[in-house]
Each structure stands twice: as structure tokens, then as C-alpha cells.
Amino acid sequence: MKVILAKRAGFCFGVKRATQMAFEAAGKDQKTFTLGPIIHSPQVVNKLEEMGVGVVKDLSGVSNGTVIIRSHGVLASEMDEAHQKQLEVVDATCPFVKKAQEHVQYLSEAGYDVLVVGDADHPEVQGIVSYGKEKVYVVASGDQVKQLPKMGKMGVVAQTTQSFDNLKSVVTECLRRGGEVRVYNTICDATAVRQQEATELAQQVDCMIVIGGFNSANTRRLAEICTEIQPRTYHIETAAEIDCSWFQGVDTVGVTAGASTPKWIIDEVMNRLDQVNNSH
């Protein structure tokens, strides 16, 4: 049984940077927390907790120590609160997310009605929106733009993991309304590259394994894309979930992983697949 690992499986730049910053902070003596999970990987979160870095949902019960800002970013008000409490802040917000926050702040201050293309329930989007003063709308698609009230000049940014096609559909709808439309392409291509690679790999194999947190939106999307092409697709978080029966009649297995999946988990899965291979 041949096993093919996608070249870009695993950590993207922003996640790698955030986890490095978190593990470095964990080595210090003072009390340290992450505001929300540092990334959408329960295994990384657990590892940090073992090192004494807990997760807090908000800062209401925190009066001192170090707070690590997660890769998705946090609300502007939460960042202000951390500074007001004179906590040591380790800002591990992905630089691409930071740029989106800054663009919303600028557009809002410059009098634009702001559209954020993305998932309103995602913490990254909630953080980006919070940097606007008022008249900031979250839209998931071009169709939703049609339902918005009449606007003046419009500014558009996107959740970093959105597809370019979706951003384009929103911008097209904004242009139809007339008036000034200012667009910042804040999409990071790490998601698109992983999705394209997974699409190509799923076409070549008899079975796909997608590794990553069940709470990771980008990993779930990878699993959906692979399933559409190869129905024998399995989304797992760890090697322990692998079932030998999945590989009956299988000659080739493709493996990919979400942008928040650490290398050690990918390595464990590859080792487990070697064991399965050797037992046949």
C-alpha cells in the first residue's frame, strides 16, 4: 500500500508563528494564559496546558501575568482590557489577520461602510469586525450584499481563509450598486494552496486521510473537498483513530492535514500507516 503525504500538509505561517510564541512564553516563570485556544488543535492546547498555560474565555478573572493572544486574534475591547490591566501581552495574532483588522479600522475611520466577507460565527471575523466603529456588515456571499441597506462609499475586506471567488462575488455585487468601492484582498493563499493540493491528491488515491481538529474550519473544509472526490475519506484528529478496515482493497492512500495540525501528529499518523502496511 502506497502512502502519499501532501507537500503542504500542516502548519501555515501564522499558526507556526503563534505556537512558537506560545511555547516560548510557556517557558517563563510567571502565570500565563491564552485568551481563547491558541489555534484550533486540541492536542496543541493540551500540550500547553501540561506546561502550565491555561485557556481563559475572557479576562474578567485575570489580574496579573502574561496573556497570549491567539492566532485568530481577539476583540479590540479585549486587547484594550489586557493593556488596561497591565498584563504582559504576547500578541500571536497572525500578521495577515492583523492586516485585516487594521484595514477595517482605517476604512471605518475614513467614513466607509465596511463589508467583511466571511463566517460571522468565526472568532477571526468577530475580531476583525470589532475594529470598526459602526456600519460594519458580515456577508457570507454576494447574494447577502443584495439584502443590505443603501450605503455610501463601501470598503471590503475578507476573512483570511475565504476563497478568492467568494470575495470576487461580493465585490461584483458591491460594484453593481454604484459609488466608490475600496477593496483590500486580505486572503492568505495558504488555504487555497492546501485545498488545491488535496483536490489533486484525492483524484489519485483509493482512500484519503485528513488530519486536524474537529473544531478547525479549514480542516473540515479539506475533508469535505476530499469526500466529494473520494468518498473513502476519513477526518481524524490523532493516529489512534485509524481503523485497519478502512484499507481493505486499497492500493494508495493520500494524507493531508489542516493548517493548525502540528507535525508531530502528522508523523504519528504516518508511522501508524506504516504499521498497518507491515501487518498486511
From Swiss-Prot:
Cofactor, free-text remark: Binds 1 [4Fe-4S] cluster per subunit.
Pathway: Isoprenoid biosynthesis; dimethylallyl diphosphate biosynthesis; dimethylallyl diphosphate from (2E)-4-hydroxy-3-methylbutenyl diphosphate: step 1/1; Isoprenoid biosynthesis; isopentenyl diphosphate biosynthesis via DXP pathway; isopentenyl diphosphate from 1-deoxy-D-xylulose 5-phosphate: step 6/6
Broad class of enzyme this protein falls into: oxidoreductase
Record-listed dimethylallyl diphosphate binding positions: H40, H72, H122, S216, N218, S260
UniProt keyword annotations, A-Z: 4Fe-4S, Iron, Iron-sulfur, Isoprene biosynthesis, Metal-binding, Oxidoreductase
UniProt KW Aminoacyl-tRNA synthetase keyword: no
Binding site for (2E)-4-hydroxy-3-methylbut-2-enyl diphosphate: H40, H72, H122, T160, S216, N218, S260
A Pfam family this chain is assigned to: LYTB
Active site residues according to the UniProt entry: E124
HAMAP family: IspH
NCBIfam families, alphabetized: ispH_lytB, PRK01045.1-1
The protein's role, per its UniProt record: Catalyzes the conversion of 1-hydroxy-2-methyl-2-(E)-butenyl 4-diphosphate (HMBPP) into a mixture of isopentenyl diphosphate (IPP) and dimethylallyl diphosphate (DMAPP). Acts in the terminal step of the DOXP/MEP pathway for isoprenoid precursor biosynthesis.
Protein name according to UniProt: 4-hydroxy-3-methylbut-2-enyl diphosphate reductase
Gene expressing this chain: ispH
